[in-house]
Amino acid sequence: IPDSIFEIAQGAFAESPKLTVLTVSENNRWYVSIDNVLYDAEKTTLLAFAGGNALSEFTVPNTVTLLGRQAFAGAVNLRCVTLGATIKDYGTGTFSSCSALESVILEDETLRVIPEDFFNGCISLHDFSMPPAVERIGARAFQLCSALESITLPRTLTELGDNAFGKCQKLKEIAVPDSVKTMGESVFTGCDHMQSASLPKSMTVLPADTFSFCYALH
């Protein structure tokens, strides 16, 4: 990235799995790259993790308060990420299509929103502890997390977006807490191995395709 660039839009390098090197000119006043990870000059925003970066484990620096849209999207070698409590804002699709990602440690227990497409397509993700204060899970947040076997939804949760857990093929059971007031369509569609599910007692409408193609549900 030359020194003339003063604005890089979020998602500019998303889904680029063969991008192994991401460097910034030393004379650029607005951006910096460390280990092929792109930040703003103050290192408060992480904009892009090179899709072909060889790192398999990564801890986001504690200076970072914002993860840009699709910041890690398509990072094919990444297996484990630690997200510190300093991060207060997440863009959509943060980890979409991180096919090798197995676990994410999220240290901020006050996080209220899991954004849209947060883990969409993370086919190896099997370990994620939902923060206890989460109120909304965005559309497709866990879609195609086909290795995820269990997830506990907190009692603070009020909204589940469309296809939030669509095609989580190994998810065996789910308990939607009574706090949930809004559910989108196809929330659990294609969860092949789901055997049991419980819904809020106050629920009056079951949205379209909520449990469609859940062949093991009984």
Region spans (language model):
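Structural signature of tandem-repeat unit edges
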Residues: I1-E7, S16-T44, F49-L66, A75-D89, ...
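Consensus positions within tandem repeat domains that build extended binding/scaffold surfaces
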Residues: Q10-A12, L47-A48, G68-A71, G91-T94, ...
